[in-house]
Amino acid sequence: MNLPDNFWNKVSEFEIILKQFNKIHSLTNYRDIKPVVEDSMKPLEFLDFNPKIVIDVGSGAGFPAIFLSLILNSSEFHLYEPIAKKSSFLSYVGAALNLKNITVHPSKIESCQKIKADLITSRALSKTLFLIEICRGFYDENTTFLLYKGDGAKEEISNLKCKNSIISSGKRNYLFLKGVKC
């Protein structure tokens, strides 16, 4: 995978900011950022297009959206995070890392103005069917969903009528959906 020259420097800056915020706001339990970065990047090996608009639902502490935005730096990222301390953190990170390709929406996605995404990502937010439901209006049949799942990914999609694939790496299941009907 071709990474931008400044990728690991930006990741180091992110890690410093995360540790500072985490002392006060308890955003995440992760102590070592490298496995999180690798987990965030892994599905890009299987993504066969360069999305113009990417939506990340329940962005939390920025996994995977911040790292994906560093790599897919010509894509426009919309991060939806309703918890104030997390959305504030994401906005601060965006400014500190000079990420001009991200917009943080401090709201639940279902409360926001609809935009069509080429790619919708989410990591450990909710069950697949619920996530699809709350994203209604943000996708069409050409949108790809990339969902970072653990166990049970296969059961979650058993009733879906769309193209799907699951790529496993360790305990992580990367779920790709395409052709989800609105």
Swiss-Prot record:
Signal peptide: none annotated. Its EC number is 2.1.1.170. It comes from the Bacteria. It catalyses: guanosine(527) in 16S rRNA + S-adenosyl-L-methionine = N(7)-methylguanosine(527) in 16S rRNA + S-adenosyl-L-homocysteine. One of its GO terms (molecular function) is rRNA (guanine-N7-)-methyltransferase activity. Keywords: Cytoplasm, Methyltransferase, rRNA processing, S-adenosyl-L-methionine, Transferase. HAMAP family: 16SrRNA_methyltr_G. Specifically methylates the N7 position of guanine in position 527 of 16S rRNA. This is Ribosomal RNA small subunit methyltransferase G. The lineage of its organism: Bacteria, Pseudomonadati, Campylobacterota, Epsilonproteobacteria, Campylobacterales.
